[in-house]
Amino acid sequence: MDLDLLRQRYLGETAASARAFREAARLIPGGVQGNIKYFDPHPLSFASAEGSWLTDADGRRYVDFLLSFGALALGHGHEVVRRAIAEALEGYGTTSFGMPYELERVMARKISERFPSIATVRFTNSGLEATLLAIRIALAASGRTHIAKFDGHYHGGHDRVLVNTTGGRRPGGGDPVAHADSLGLAAYHLEHTVVLPFNDVESSSRILKARSGEVGAVVVEPVQAGYIEPEPGFLNAVRALTSDLGMVLIFDEVKTGFRTALGGAQEYYGVEPDLTALGKILGGGLPIGAVGGRGDLMELCSPARSRNLADVVFHSGTFNGNPMSLATGLATIGHLEEPGRFDELLVGTEALKRGIVASGRAHGFNVETPGAGTIFNVAVGLQDEGDAREFSPQFLRQCLDYSLMHYGVFSKPMNRFSMATSHRNAEIAHTLSAFDSAFGELATLVEGAR
């Protein structure tokens, strides 16, 4: 069985999803509401969800490790989230005030308690908006025009950061070369973005020192893509370097906040940034983002400083800090904070990772599960060097993903795995059984090609 046959089997099992995709493609560009949500030959169309399980349009069920790209820490439809929505709507009588109210203060206080680097907070409606605002604040504070980001790091779909999100362009092993990752990106953004190599202190230091008069902000995913960890001491070095050069350090913790640790990667690695961008879990499954950090930086957003727009960092949004998102976010965080809850989630994550590695090795594969906290990925290689030259890790992972969907496990092909409290022993057992069957199919594929 090869990749084409795996896809043919997928087509045969997902006819209703295929029909839904064809209809969607007539109404929605590409048939999806975000480019990363597409995969060949068509994405699954889902009908319902409960706990850790998804049901697609064909009635097939999957243990879900996509979890809305990591936003669902408790799984789907958890009772505390349902109750929070109902109580907020009943108590406030509205889904949005559009003006100040109680939960804004409650959530701001909770974030500050969990993230000691955060003195004050502004809410947004997405992680994208959060990184956009953080960069705006940083450049206003520094008085400089350029930002620096790391090769392969993703900070949302706005123009300032749609540069080198995929990484990999280092001619001759030299410094990363800036490239646009979207049509319509003005040359200005490439010209005003300095790209740094992640986990390379020496090169990053050299580049930043050479551009120190221009770069006002350095934005980084402290754990790249949520699962590629920083080398020991790397974040500390970036922290010291940005402080020495008068640059504002921004941690994009949209993926890692409440996942790597309850206090994010900055708690896990013991490094405090100047500004932090949050999202995903912060909303408990509803749209949200937040920027927080040093009081002097955040105060640049305060309209009390001046009524002249040009003297203040502009920030606004109709639904910023709305009752539904803050209520579900507070309920989710509160559940994760219950004694032993997050530790239990970490134990389940590690048990699953160990089982996946053991299963893969039993079938003749080198398997790694890089990650920190409750996010990880699965990398597959071959133990035989001759076979390894013929079958790339990317090809093997693609085959594995289509097999996993056949056996009832979903993370979206080539995507990372996120854990939820709803992943109990039964779901972990089902998942390990699926991996064992999928690795078996993969071994047959490799053997048949010899």
Model-identified regions with their sequence ranges:
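Conserved N-terminal phosphate-binding loop of PLP-dependent enzymes in the Aspartate aminotransferase
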Residues: 1-450
